[in-house]
């Protein structure tokens, strides 16, 4: 009987109930709330669901992220190995390849001025960088946090891993993902505040047709030019353009379909669960998380405002031919930001079709955010 009682006592004490802190229970509730949003309200479920489940797992069973050096048998936790793919920049780069395979750069090629709007929207990144320095973060942490301003989830993870700021990767990833999802809520008030009714009603001329040759040359030329100037961008820009070359060449249909579908979804599962697993109670429930979330919001708002204001400048310089609303699409939340430009423009004039014009700055923003990340890597000597 004593043996049975002792065995039962050991089993009971090995349950998670005896090993978790109040913080773990808080994070379990947060994870369940995120799962509710993903399943019941379909709030960007492709990423939110695996992130939330990773968050749930690590706060119930922290050893699922156990480092091999701390394991009795030398084997790390399952999600630790998933996470190493984030840390080594493999998963974010593969995400970029999938995005490239799904992206049509035609609107950007047809209107190269869109590059300027995409660049202007990156202002929020550098505003957040100096804000983070002011709040007491060191320079590398500030750089990792600032990329949230581009509303680019994979790039945020990529830079945080490259700069060795894995301790704050969870809050950065959650903030970046949240603002990417909240584009339709955050952007419209800023866009309406900074533009007049007359400006919002401006109709832009139809974009010129883009030839197949131009579409094939674009990823090759961008890779050569950008990577020669800033070699540190090669993992992101290179993979983005490789995926796009798959799409536009027309000779590797199977690779295009795999990169944009099967491989993309596999990577999203690995990326989402591993990033969610970085949000343990110890890493997430602290003052720095609140600072990161606040900085991310400020950065995103600054980026949106900078894009719109630069759009207004281009409107004046073009004699009223450019609608400033497309400037807000310069953040790299593709295609949500472009759809918001279309929606806000249609509210002033239902016959105004801005979507294709906004896609130019939108895809330029993807390149711009990758370049900003590469710039920080070059500054800090990280390759």
Where are these regions (language model features)?
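Intrinsically disordered, low-complexity non-transmembrane regions of multi-pass membrane transporters
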Residues: 1-19, 25, 75, 189-218, ...
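Membrane-embedded hairpin module used as a gating/binding unit in multi-pass transport
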Residues: 175-251
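Transmembrane helical segments that form the transport core of multi-pass membrane transport proteins
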Residues: 223-307
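Transmembrane alpha-helix boundary signature
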Residues: 60-80, 97-109, 131-142, 282
